[in-house]
């Protein structure tokens, strides 16, 4: 458990390559000391997707932490919206330039979703179809809106949300880091209540597991973030595991509550019989997997 800016956070991070793909192009990371959590999904079909996602998580943790440090931790005067926008614009340019300068990285890009618990509020930034949900009072709500072709069709009333799930172009994103030279970041902030659970995930989860199943599993686990993270990954793999699957779960707890926090990165394992357990983290420093 970490306490940051009046919030006590219990969290778990887990990533798995799935049953089909030998390479995990997802990346997850956190700086729990400042309440910062980041998930990225290197876009399938592009070169060096794993480079783009890992680069994104690592550099954003460093950049955002440095921006907050320069403000001397002055949460009251620090503007997280500007910090997130500036960091994402710089990250987009860095990936785009790297792709231009190396044939090995040509066309690489990544989605990203960021949750930053700061000053008693939650700031959310994203690009692409990696999502952030909030579970409050037993109700799971999708907070982010996918930047995708299928979502645009849903918004236009041309297809239903269920029909969009089976479209041939369902994985075509309309915004991603490194895909174009310019990026208009999407950043919003939300209130936070004790007991809230925030779920961040790559599309490897949402393509395999329904909205109702996700909410039911977390509540069925008694809002235990570590157990929920493990079981969500297992559920995606049991449903076929066609893509890499990553989840970050953060529960806002009372300051005096006690809970472990963990990061797990499983290796490719079709029968799910063996998963590598990563020890409980008790560090303030950023962690990337």
Label each region the model flagged:
Residues 1-289:
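PP2C/PPM-type serine/threonine phosphatase catalytic domain
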